[in-house]
Amino acid sequence: MARYDRAITVFSPDGHLFQVEYALEAVRKGNAAVGVRGSDTVVLGVEKKSTPKLQDSRSVRKIASLDTHIALACAGLKADARVLINRARVECQSHRLTVEDAVTVEYITRYIAGLQQKYTQSGGVRPFGLSTLIVGFDPYTDKPALYQTDPSGTFSAWKANATGRNSNSMREFLEKNYKETSGKETIKLAIRALLEVVESGGKNIEIAVMTQKDGLRQLEEAEIDEYVAEIEAEKAAAEAAKKGAPKET
């Protein structure tokens, strides 16, 4: 049993690669992350741990730009994320130099997933302990896209998805409430999904919004607080309306 448990390239008798499963467990223990694709907007949101008083909070951002039209959020080991993000950025620039055109969102997703898969079957390495949510606008179609990859190298396209801590709760919320919206409504849906699992409201949330026209923009804490206040007001109004509704006889 111990041999299957430790060796990265050896399957257990029942078909498991334990090191990949342990990497998936690292993702489940990581920060919550959510991605939502709207009609003209894509939004990434992550759970933000409170930083020590003397630490520069800008140095611990969990949403990264890969190119002018692609961004990535991740859940899992931050050091692994840094390596994967740097490799993806180099690939984006290399593609521009070689092909003289920007990568598509699917292309860079395939590259990242391929890299993650390679690290599940090579000796002397271990799987990346992170799952990624990749958003952007394709340069040829101008359509928004959202993809997810995991430590096994699997990738898939989504309308909305979540990963990390309590991702099942967020995913259930998104399944019940997702509609293809635009602008502010897309941002609010991502924040509402995060508020399902994140305590202390907006101060523990990091949000990035991308549009075809303006590119990627990180929301300031004050902007997030405004959205949270609006969401809480809507929730209170809905509860009041429910209490005031006449009971059916």
Swiss-Prot record:
CDD domains hit by this protein: proteasome_alpha_type_7
TM annotation in the entry: none
GO annotations of cellular component type: cytoplasm; nucleus; proteasome core complex, alpha-subunit complex
UniProt-annotated location(s): Cytoplasm; Nucleus
Biological process terms in GO annotation: ubiquitin-dependent protein catabolic process
Alphabetic keyword roster: Cytoplasm, Nucleus, Proteasome
Matching Gene3D superfamilies: Glutamine Phosphoribosylpyrophosphate, subunit 1, domain 1 (3.60.20.10)
Entry annotated with the keyword Acyltransferase: no
One Pfam match: Proteasome
Disulphide connectivity of cysteines: none
UniProt KW Cytoplasm keyword: yes
Binding partners and assembly: The 26S proteasome consists of a 20S proteasome core and two 19S regulatory subunits. The 20S proteasome core is composed of 28 subunits that are arranged in four stacked rings, resulting in a barrel-shaped structure. The two end rings are each formed by seven alpha subunits, and the two central rings are each formed by seven beta subunits. The catalytic chamber with the active sites is on the inside of the barrel.
Function: The proteasome is a multicatalytic proteinase complex which is characterized by its ability to cleave peptides with Arg, Phe, Tyr, Leu, and Glu adjacent to the leaving group at neutral or slightly basic pH. The proteasome has an ATP-dependent proteolytic activity.
Protein family: Belongs to the peptidase T1A family.
Name assigned to this protein: Proteasome subunit alpha type-7-B
Originating species: Oryza sativa subsp. indica (Rice)
Gene for this chain: PAD1
